[in-house]
Structures are given as C-alpha cells and as structure tokens.
Amino acid sequence: MKVRESGMPPPDTWDAYFEPDSILSKLGLTSACHDVVEFGCGYGTFTIPAARRVTGTVFTLDIDEVMIATTRRCAERFDLRNINFKLGDFVTGGTGRPSGSVDYAMLFNIIHHEQPLNLLREAYRNLKAGGSVGIVHWIYDATTPRGPPMDVRPRPEQSLQWAIEAGFTPKSDIIALPPYHYGLVLSRIKK
C-alpha cells in the first residue's frame, strides 16, 4: 500500500526543499548511531547523508521499486556500501527487522499515512531501548509548495500525540526546520 498523497516531484525539485545534513543534525542522527531504519527512501535525500554519518547500516525500505533503484544508483555513485535496500510494504508487512535491532528510525514526510499509529508502533518495535525516532513533516500551512492536502496533513502537535500513543517519550520540543518542515525527536525508554 502506498501512503496517500505521496507523489514525488522531479528529484531536483524535491531536493531543493531540504537541507538534509542540517535536518539530520537537528534530529540527533550522529555517528553515535550504529544502525538506522528508514521508512520510505524516496530519492535517497536523507538515505545518503544518513549512511555517511552512521557507523553501521542504514536499512531503507520503500514500496516503489523506482525509488529503490534511484537511491541505489545514488549510493553507488558515492561508493556507499552500508545501505541495505528492501522493496516492500512496511506498513502492512513490517520492516522484516528483528525487534530492538536499530538505534534510530527515520519517519520523514510519511506520518500523514492512513494508519500513523501502526507506522509509529513498527518504528518503536524496531528500536533498541534508548533508541530514537526522528519525524519530519510539512508544516501545517497551505502555502507550502508541496505536501499532502491540509485535510490529511498533521499538525506538529498531532504527530507528537500519535508518537506518545505509540509508546514514545519526547526528547525535545517541536523543532523548526524552515522554511517548510517541522521535526520531532522521541525515544524508546530503556527497560
């Protein structure tokens, strides 16, 4: 199942909306993270910078084989060998990763999914105790150049509430990622 309203513009247009390294830094994805799971690689906008940062592997998933192929070519161009690609529907089938196996989960521009709690619960399941989830989404403003329609676009407070309902604990306030996005960082409390 594809995420509603998730059509992608041309790669250059998409990439112009983000400063990936700055966003990853603000969301706490550092070299202290070993393994990362990314829910939806898209063009690899965040996959490639994440792979350059972490000491382990970025496990990236997407339902669209074109997105997987595009990101794979980009990884090859930069000679990145620490990315594991998986084509599949992680919403209905999960990631296929063992529970508690990654340090960080990336949910970027995907939380408007029809079942955000299921998506967040799968991210929670994947994380080690003490691991973090980074959420990035379009701000709740109809003038943004892209993003899902306003009737399905979550406000930051709604995304935060869903994450708390899924079991996460906030690590920070809502993070401004101008000009078009906001971010959240939450953790799976150690048990």
Which ranges hold each PLM region?
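Class I SAM-dependent methyltransferase Rossmann-like catalytic core
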Residues: M1-F18
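Conserved alpha-helix/loop element of class I SAM-dependent methyltransferases that forms part
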Residues: D15-H34
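Class I SAM-dependent methyltransferase SAM/SAH-binding core
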Residues: V37, Y43-G93
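A short acidic, Gly/Pro-enriched loop at the edge of an enzyme's catalytic core
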Residues: T95-Y104
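A short SAM/SAH-binding and catalytic strip from SAM-dependent methyltransferases
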Residues: D103-P116
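A short glycine-rich, Lys/Arg-flanked "PGG" loop and its adjoining helix->strand segment in the class I
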Residues: N118-S132
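Conserved class I S-adenosyl-L-methionine
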Residues: G134-Q158
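Core SAM-dependent methyltransferase catalytic element
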Residues: I175-K191
